């Protein structure tokens, strides 16, 4: 996989532009503006705490489904997306793995292209900020 521009990635064996990161508007919808957004996402410790991160359920899902998700094997059947708490990277050092994560958006800062938007989560606290694109954050690719 390699990065081709601010929001597009190429995965080996697939056409360029097939994979991308979500935009600022798409992340905003998932995390904040859709109906019951705060009930359709939750910090979870799955598989007896082995996998920690944010679970995001699809639209129109009964929020009670969240309590039944206790392992990674439950994710596909519920249509959920799991964002691991992968920490962040500064230089070659990974910090806070298992407790926080930051995920890049495909939207650069309008005023300064060396910055881009990213989502930060710790437990159930989710926020959005802008940071230097050279900093190490995770990406969630979609088709």
Where do the language-model regions lie?
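Conserved positions within compact, well-structured domain cores
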Residues: 1-143
């Amino acid at each position: 996989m390699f990065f081709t521009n601010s929001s597009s990635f190429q995965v080996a064996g697939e056409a360029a532009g097939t994979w991308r990161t979500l935009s600022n508007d798409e992340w905003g919808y998932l995390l904040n503006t859709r109906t019951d957004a705060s009930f359709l996402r939750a910090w979870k410790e799955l598989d007896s705490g082995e996998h920690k991160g944010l679970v995001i359920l699809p639209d129109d899902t009964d929020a009670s489904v969240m309590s039944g998700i206790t392992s990674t094997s439950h994710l596909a059947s519920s249509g959920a997306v799991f964002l691991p708490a992968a920490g962040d990277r500064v230089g070659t050092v990974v910090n806070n793995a298992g407790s926080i994560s930051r995920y890049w958006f495909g939207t650069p800062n309008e005023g300064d292209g060396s910055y881009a938007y990213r989502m930060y989560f710790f437990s159930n606290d989710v926020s959005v900020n802008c940071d230097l694109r050279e900093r190490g954050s995770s990406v969630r690719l979609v088709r």
